[in-house]
Structure formats: C-alpha cells, structure tokens
Amino acid sequence: MKKAILQRPAQYRIKRAIITTRTEEGCIHRMYVAGHSVGRARVDLSAAQGDPWAYCELLYIEPEMRGQGLGTELLRWMAARYGSVVVAPDNRGAQRLYQRLGREAYGREAYYYIDQGFGVYEIM
C-alpha cells in the first residue's frame, strides 16, 4: 500500500519531510512521504567531539519502500547536515551503498571505539 503512494504521477507532487528528534547521544531523523513513515536514521553525535562528522548507527528504509532512492535521499540530507558520516568496517551493506553513490574511504579512524577502526565515507 505504501509503495503505491510513491508511484503516483509527478504532477501530484508528493510531500516529503524529515523530522528530527534530539536524544542524549545525538538525533533520530524520521523520513515521511505523503504523511507515511518510510524510514529513519539514528546518528550518534557524542563520538564526534567537535569534528565535522557523525556516526550513523542506523539507516533503515521500510522493506516495501526500498529501491526508490529514499535511502540515498536520506543520506544526502544527512551529508548536508553533518558533513561526513562514519561507517564501521564490518558494515558491508552500508559500505556498498556509499560506494554506489561514488564515495570511497579516505581514512581510518580509531575514534570513539578505540579498539575498532572506522572507514570514513564522505557522502556529499
């Protein structure tokens, strides 16, 4: 049912919104299309400590809404807001998504989780 909402002709101009809720550690960004929740991202800002990037703990698009560019749109929105996003080296799905967007790792950071390295992907 939700998928049909996005398949209307372009002349109907479907309203999209991203609503942000602050948490103690960072933010939760919820994406809505035509009033329906279609996805969310949870961003940890406590790891950044003043640096121009954020750790994206979660990026989730409802299964029936995937393949329509909503995850890409949410990532681009976060890139405009935060600059860069950090991705764990064992998160292959996120790394593939960033690489499909034409982004590559430009460094290794032993940041926040000292015993783990994080590949940093610019998504702007």
Model-derived regions, located:
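Acetyl-CoA-dependent GNAT
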Residues: 3-53, 57
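C-terminal "cap" of GNAT-fold acetyltransferases
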Residues: 29-30, 89-92, 109-124
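A structural microfeature
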Residues: 37-39, 71, 107
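A short, internal acetyl-CoA/4′-phosphopantetheine-binding micro-motif in the GNAT/acyltransferase core
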Residues: 57-66
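Conserved acetyl-CoA pyrophosphate-binding loop and the N-cap/start of the following alpha-helix
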Residues: 65, 69-77
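Conserved short alpha-helix immediately C-terminal to the canonical SAM/SAH-binding motif I
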Residues: 74, 93-97
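Conserved GNAT acetyl-CoA-binding A-motif
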Residues: 80-92
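Conserved acetyl-CoA-binding loop of GNAT-fold acetyltransferases
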Residues: 101-108
